[in-house]
């Protein structure tokens, strides 16, 4: 019962049997050298990849229901419609579309540079901010009742049509002058 390396690679059981000098075909029987040996341990090898939370794959959403259309309003007042996926956070979505939402702490809840205003119609659809987000929002300039940190807003189907307005200014208390590169 040996497993193969993903995609037709080397059979792990074959390598183990060869190393031990026994060629087990099934439990209770063997081929090969004629020496008695313990059955080889079967291990599975898999090739896996990772996708950081909130990052869109090149192929786009798998199903149309995964798409959430939102609008960003930049500092000049220009409305910029964008499409994201369920599970994306607003900070990474804005950065992927070239919007000026800084995110100096790279979504670690250590700054307020991804501060946005959420449209009133959609604000109540978000879970309330936790204590750490509230602490960071306290340092955000131009704080309003509908202020939230973009890194903490995760897109859901209910946020279809939501507007996220960028405040006129932000303050980077994290590292003076540090501007991270989007992932």
Curated annotation (Swiss-Prot):
Cofactor: [2Fe-2S] cluster
2Fe-2S ferredoxin-type domain segment(s): 68-170
Listed GO CC annotations: mitochondrial matrix; mitochondrion
Molecular function, one GO term: 2 iron, 2 sulfur cluster binding
Cofactor note (record): Binds 1 [2Fe-2S] cluster.
Keywords for this protein: 2Fe-2S, Electron transport, Iron, Iron-sulfur, Metal-binding, Mitochondrion, Transit peptide, Transport
Annotated GO biological process: [2Fe-2S] cluster assembly; [4Fe-4S] cluster assembly; electron transport chain; P450-containing electron transport chain; ubiquinone biosynthetic process
Chain sites annotated for binding [2Fe-2S] cluster: 105, 111, 114, 151
Transit peptide: 1-52
Primary residence: mitochondrion
Cell compartment(s), UniProt: Mitochondrion; Mitochondrion matrix
Family label: Belongs to the adrenodoxin/putidaredoxin family.
Function as written in the Swiss-Prot or TrEMBL entry: Electron donor, of the core iron-sulfur cluster (ISC) assembly complex, that acts to reduce the persulfide into sulfide during [2Fe-2S] clusters assembly on the scaffolding protein ISCU. The core iron-sulfur cluster (ISC) assembly complex is involved in the de novo synthesis of a [2Fe-2S] cluster, the first step of the mitochondrial iron-sulfur protein biogenesis. This process is initiated by the cysteine desulfurase complex (NFS1:LYRM4:NDUFAB1) that produces persulfide which is delivered on the scaffold protein ISCU in a FXN-dependent manner.
UniProt xrefs under PANTHER family: FERREDOXIN-2, MITOCHONDRIAL (PTHR23426:SF65), FERREDOXIN/ADRENODOXIN (PTHR23426)
Subunit: Component of the mitochondrial core iron-sulfur cluster (ISC) complex composed of NFS1, LYRM4, NDUFAB1, ISCU, FXN, and FDX2; this complex is a heterohexamer containing two copies of each monomer. Form a heterodimer complex with NFS1. Interacts (in both their reduced and oxidized states) with the cysteine desulfurase (NFS1:LYRM4) complex; this interaction stimulates cysteine desulfurase activity, and serves as a reductant for Fe-S cluster assembly.
Protein name in UniProt: Ferredoxin-2, mitochondrial
Organism taxonomic ancestry: Eukaryota, Metazoa, Chordata, Craniata, Vertebrata
């Amino acid at each position: 019962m040996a497993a193969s390396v993903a995609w037709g690679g080397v059979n792990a059981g074959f390598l183990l049997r060869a190393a031990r000098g026994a060629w087990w075909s099934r439990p209770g029987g063997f081929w090969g050298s004629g020496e008695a040996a313990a059955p080889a341990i079967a291990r599975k090898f898999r090739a896996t990849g990772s996708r950081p939370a909130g990052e869109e794959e090149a192929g786009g959403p798998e199903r149309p229901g995964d798409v959430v259309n939102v609008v960003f309003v930049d500092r000049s007042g220009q409305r910029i419609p964008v499409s994201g996926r369920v599970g994306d956070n607003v900070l990474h979505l804005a950065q992927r579309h070239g919007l000026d939402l800084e995110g100096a702490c790279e979504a670690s809840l250590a700054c307020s540079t991804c501060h946005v205003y959420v449209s009133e119609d959609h604000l109540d659809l978000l879970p309330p901010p936790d204590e750490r987000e509230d602490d960071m929002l306290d340092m955000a300039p131009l704080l309003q009742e509908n202020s939230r940190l973009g890194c903490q807003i995760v897109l859901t189907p209910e946020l279809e049509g939501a507007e996220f307005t960028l405040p006129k200014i932000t303050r980077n208390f994290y590292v003076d002058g540090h501007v991270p590169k989007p992932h």
